[in-house]
């Protein structure tokens, strides 16, 4: 009985691994996301390379991520919500373009600008 249960467990683990591998799903989640690359690809056009808005971003009301007051009063959840939903006529929503792991990883980049 023990052998049968053990073999069934191994079989399930192998099948789960195969499904994960062939579906392209990462088992490590946010751990292997290059958040800086995601930021540079999707955010820097308006928010700038260093978290200081570009001229385009300033015209759209982009946040100054290095602003200590904004950093202190803004929660990670608010940042995630903003990235997901955007702001009409100012910032496009990214919930359809980025994974939730990528969006969560962007929080660390945004927070990093407050430490510089």
Task: Go through the PLM ranges and name each one.
Residues 63-77, 94-103:
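Electron-transfer interface patches adjacent to heme c in soluble/periplasmic c-type cytochromes
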Residues 89, 96-116:
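C-terminal capping alpha-helices of c-type cytochrome domains
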Residues 72-90:
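Short Fe-S-cluster ligation motifs
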Residues 14, 50-53, 79:
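Short hydrophobic/aromatic-rich motifs at helix boundaries and adjacent loops
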Residues 2-6, 38-48, 65-73:
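Phosphate-binding glycine-rich loops and adjacent basic patches that engage nucleotide phosphates
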Residues 1-31, 116:
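N-terminal export/targeting leaders of redox proteins
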Residues 36-37, 41-44, 77, 81, ...:
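Solvent-exposed, polar/charged alpha-helical surfaces in well-ordered, non-transmembrane soluble domains
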Residues 32, 36-61, 85-90, 112-116:
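Periplasmic/extracellular electron-transfer cofactor-ligation site
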């Amino acid at each position: 009985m023990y052998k049968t249960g053990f073999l069934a467990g191994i079989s399930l683990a192998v099948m789960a691994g195969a499904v994960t591998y062939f579906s392209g799903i990462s088992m490590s989640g946010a751990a292997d996301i290059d958040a800086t690359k995601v930021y540079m690809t999707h955010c820097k056009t308006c928010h700038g390379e260093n978290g200081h808005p570009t001229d385009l971003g300033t015209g759209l009301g982009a946040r100054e991520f290095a602003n200590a007051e904004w950093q202190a009063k803004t929660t990670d959840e608010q940042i995630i919500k903003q990235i997901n939903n955007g702001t009409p006529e100012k910032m496009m929503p990214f919930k359809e373009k980025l994974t939730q792991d990528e969006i969560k990883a962007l929080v660390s980049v945004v927070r990093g600008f407050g430490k510089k």
